[in-house]
Amino acid sequence: MIGYVTLGTNNKARAEKFYDELLKEIGAGRFMETERFTAYSAASDKPGIGITIPYDGKPATVGNGTMVALQVDSPEKVNTFYRKAIALGAKDEGKPGPRGESGFYAAYFRDLDGNKLNVFCFEKKN
């Protein structure tokens, strides 16, 4: 299973400010830092997300078709997380709402470096 995902950034301080505030919404915070890399998680034994200035010295670019999905436990949390991302300067890529008939509820946005993220939950069916 996935341990963590890393996204590139060209401005680590700006990315840290964005993710510090955003990931607080789901109980995650910084747990590992170096000069070029910062990792976030709810706990060191839980999946996480990292941001990094590329080690090859080239500019960070967005992966075409790449997306990071963060799971929460309710549509309300999807809505809150999405609104927080937009308030922090993220770009809308799909407003919160149900997708299909499976109970999948999601929202999509791009962070300040253009990386695409999704926040989702599975609604309980009655």
Question: Language model features by range: what are they?
Answer:
Residues 1-16, 68, 123-126:
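N-terminal beta-strand motif that seeds the catalytic metal site of vicinal oxygen chelate
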Residues 4-6, 50, 67, 108, ...:
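Conserved beta-strand segments that form the floor/walls of ligand-binding pockets within enzyme
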Residues 26, 86-126:
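Vicinal oxygen chelate
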Residues 41-80:
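Long, continuous compositionally biased terminal/linker segments
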